[in-house]
Amino acid sequence: MSKMIRQKTDRSDCEVIANFCLQNDLRYWEPKSQTSKELHEINCRLDSLKMELNRLNNQLEKSYLNEKVKKSINEEMDFIKNQIKTLEIEAQQIVVQNKKLQRNFEIITSIQGVGSKLALAILADADFERFQNGRQYAAFVGVTPSHFQSGTSVKRKSQISRIGSSNLRKILYMNALVVKNRNVDFADFVERLQEKGKAPKVIIVAIMRKLMNIIYGMLKNNQKFDKSLAFGC
């Protein structure tokens, strides 16, 4: 919270900082490990490559392109696909060589419908140890509701916050679709949302949020998926 300060001295600055620390539950900042940095860098590069691949694919769909241009685009896309495959293998090797990452990878993928791509993206960009609860974890990924209201007349429809890694969120979305259609452990959860009249897309976002909450709890407790713990039944 900001304060009205009439003077600025080293002493007053120290008092403000000290009061802030006393009034807030702060955690020590810890730098990422070298392994985490490497995974993060690979994931960022993968994100860029996939965006470029999508751009080229959109360009390829234009009907007026001549054959030489199409050939050039296809060759570039093949090159990018090989780069993506190489980096994904490199990321997997980093995980296999680190016992903690390997264990966390196994924990995340113990949920039916959650694949290796999502697990790698989470390990690279969403370190659970930085957060105090599952809601914070889900908020970091950008799948918690965002509300906007000004006065009594301006009120927008709630939507997800979309902060965090867009690539992670895209992979999470695809995994949520698989979980909805194939994971029987989520059937009751989905059915309750449907009975409330929730739209299909809202249900998918709810599954995304639920997955991040469950994954946080699993990683925090070093435990693979257990339906009774995940859904409290």
Each predicted region: which residue ranges?
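Phosphate-backbone recognition surface of nucleic-acid-processing proteins
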Residues: 121-196, 200
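Amphipathic, charged-and-aliphatic alpha-helical interface segments
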Residues: 82-95, 99, 116-129, 170-176
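Short, solvent-exposed helix-loop connector elements
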Residues: 2, 30-40, 62, 156-159, ...
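Helix-hairpin-helix
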Residues: 104-126, 137
